């Protein structure tokens, strides 16, 4: 968010405004007392009710914005505030930003725009209109009896009023500033989310509620969060999600959560190309992920979804092929053949025996060339489609690599997702048949990144395929494969891609991955399945460690 400049430093005036805030709050809180008496058991009442979080401007605005030369104040969010607000936006908590009377127009305007940007409530506590607004809000909130007030330092009288009416107060900063024993203290803004999560679990008092700490790259987290995957307010099956922060001591965070959901491949720094691919050998993880791995190794009863050793095979396309070959036993008379694509591992593109090796592997052109490392490094998805052996020269695909048959599949790919015990699938447009690709290649290898620049069939090519008598997908066969894969892999959530070969009707599994986005599955179906899968996996693993 862009910063704003104002000409007057208003921070010294904040303390003088606290008595006004206290005055405005008192009348509303007194009116709510009788309603609270009707519902004294807050722990039992918490589930199914809203959780409110009021963020005082003091925890959001950066107090160090004065420039000595210009004597101006830069109105901006303090470090860590933007990430906090982004996560709170999709937390299912009801959040409001408040500020006392006395801020400049630029400061209050900045806060109002911030609240609007993140879809939060905005509460300018000014008199007289602010009093009426606050009265109305407090009367409404009194029915929830589950509110947090977050500040970096307030009037002691205000704290007492809030606590007398069952508000939780979280104060950031030096504990010596606030002597009130009932205040929850945090030293950094990054501690707020895990503090909220553990406080909510404590207030619920429900033994079936679990705190899930999660680790993944920011873009993936945001994609999941926007779909409602990571609520801090408990999900329908009592899961509370909170991101693990590498800016804070991890050991203390891991002691506060019940389990960790991770995308370990997001935290790979490097894979040594000179080491034999026998993961985790040769993998360098981020310092934070390395610490989590050590913690899990030292605490064998700690639950991670999924165990690291179960995921390592999916980093290697050779191991993926070997896993898929084990599914071929599902094929039977009267059913399509289920198989992995024919493949060959190569260490060099210049070998004199390459033509012979291709024949022995039953491979013919065109071929897809893929790096053996399947994910976690920048070039893992750099691939090529080649149409003759001469095109191997000067190929830029990383080695070692696998050569895989290209399957004409009518430009349709079936994406399957196993989420716990539930299996979903979606149909997507895919690469056109080889004849179309060859005509557009210009006699050169067709290079692409499978995540970014995958060549997809044109509308005309899709229409041609629709007219053709395409083979139908055997859903039952693929679902059986999904169940067997779940047993073989020991994974809670995974995905795989199936294409149906036009010439034979063979069902060929061409890709396998851990914790996919499953964005093709509607959120109202996917998210409950996602939460159930996590909880069932956790309870199953805990039961195993206790026996």
From Swiss-Prot:
Mg(2+) 2 binds at residues 511, 513. Its EC number is 2.7.1.134, 2.7.1.159. Mg(2+) 1 binds at residues 497, 511. ATP binds at residues 317, 370, 404-415, 430, 450. SUPFAM superfamilies: Glutathione synthetase ATP-binding domain-like. Keywords: ATP-binding, Kinase, Magnesium, Metal-binding, Nucleotide-binding, Transferase. Transmembrane segments: none annotated. It comes from the Eukaryota. GO terms for biological process: inositol trisphosphate metabolic process; myo-inositol hexakisphosphate biosynthetic process. Kinase that can phosphorylate various inositol polyphosphate such as Ins(3,4,5,6)P4 or Ins(1,3,4)P3 and participates in phytic acid biosynthesis in developing seeds. Phytic acid is the primary storage form of phosphorus in cereal grains and other plant seeds. This is Inositol-tetrakisphosphate 1-kinase 6.
């Amino acid at each position: 968010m862009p910063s704003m400049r104002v000409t007057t430093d208003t921070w010294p005036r904040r303390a003088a405004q606290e008595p006004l805030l206290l005055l405005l709050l008192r009348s509303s809180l007194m009116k709510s007392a009788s309603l609270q008496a009707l519902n004294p058991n807050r722990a039992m009442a918490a589930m199914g009710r809203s959780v409110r979080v009021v963020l005082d401007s003091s925890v959001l605005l950066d107090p160090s914005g004065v420039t000595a030369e210009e004597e101006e104040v830069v109105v901006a969010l303090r470090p860590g505030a933007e990430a906090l607000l982004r996560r709170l936006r999709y937390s299912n908590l009801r959040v409001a930003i408040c500020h006392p009377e006395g801020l400049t127009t630029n400061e209050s305007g900045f806060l109002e725009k911030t609240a609007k940007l993140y879809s939060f409530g905005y509460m300018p506590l000014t008199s007289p209109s602010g009093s009426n607004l606050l009265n109305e809000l407090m009367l409404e909130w009194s029915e929830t009896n589950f509110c947090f007030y977050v500040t970096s330092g307030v009037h002691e009288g205000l704290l007492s009023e809030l606590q007398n009416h069952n508000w939780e107060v979280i104060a950031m900063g030096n504990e010596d500033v606030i002597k009130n024993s009932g205040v929850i203290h945090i030293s950094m803004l990054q501690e707020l989310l895990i503090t909220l999560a553990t406080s909510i679990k404590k207030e619920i008092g429900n033994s079936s509620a679990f705190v899930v700490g999660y680790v993944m790259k920011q873009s993936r987290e945001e994609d999941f969060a926007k779909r409602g995957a990571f609520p801090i307010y408990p999900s329908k099956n009592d899961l509370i999600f909170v991101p693990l922060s590498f800016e804070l001591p991890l050991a203390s965070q891991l002691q506060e959560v019940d389990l960790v959901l991770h995308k370990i491949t997001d935290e790979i720094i490097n894979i040594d190309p000179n080491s034999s691919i026998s993961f985790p050998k040769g993998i360098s993880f981020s310092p934070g992920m390395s610490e989590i791995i050590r913690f899990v190794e030292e605490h064998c009863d700690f639950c991670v979804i999924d165990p690291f050793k179960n995921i390592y095979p999916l980093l290697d396309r050779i191991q993926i092929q070997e896993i898929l070959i084990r599914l071929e036993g599902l094929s039977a008379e009267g059913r399509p053949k289920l198989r992995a694509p024919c493949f060959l591992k190569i260490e060099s593109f210049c070998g004199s025996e390459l033509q012979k090796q291709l024949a022995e592997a039953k491979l013919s052109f065109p071929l897809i060339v893929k790096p053996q490392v399947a994910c976690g490094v920048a070039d893992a998805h750099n691939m090529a489609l080649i149409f003759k052996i001469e095109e191997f020269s000067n190929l830029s695909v990383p080695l070692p690599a696998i050569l895989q048959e290209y399957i004409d599949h009518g430009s349709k790919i079936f994406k399957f997702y196993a989420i716990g015990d539930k299996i979903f699938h979606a149909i997507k447009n895919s690469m056109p048949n080889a004849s179309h690709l060859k005509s557009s290649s210009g006699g050169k290898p067709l290079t692409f990144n499978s995540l970014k620049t995958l060549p997809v069939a044109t509308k005309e090519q899709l229409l041609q395929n629709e007219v053709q008598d395409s083979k139908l997908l055997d859903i039952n066969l693929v679902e059986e494969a999904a169940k067997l894969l779940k047993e073989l892999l020991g994974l809670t959530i995974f995905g795989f891609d199936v294409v149906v070969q036009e010439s034979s009707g063979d069902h060929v599994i061409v890709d396998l991955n851990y914790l996919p986005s499953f964005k093709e599955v509607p959120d109202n179906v996917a998210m409950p399945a996602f939460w159930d899968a996590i909880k069932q996996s956790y309870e199953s693993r805990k039961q195993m460690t206790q026996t």
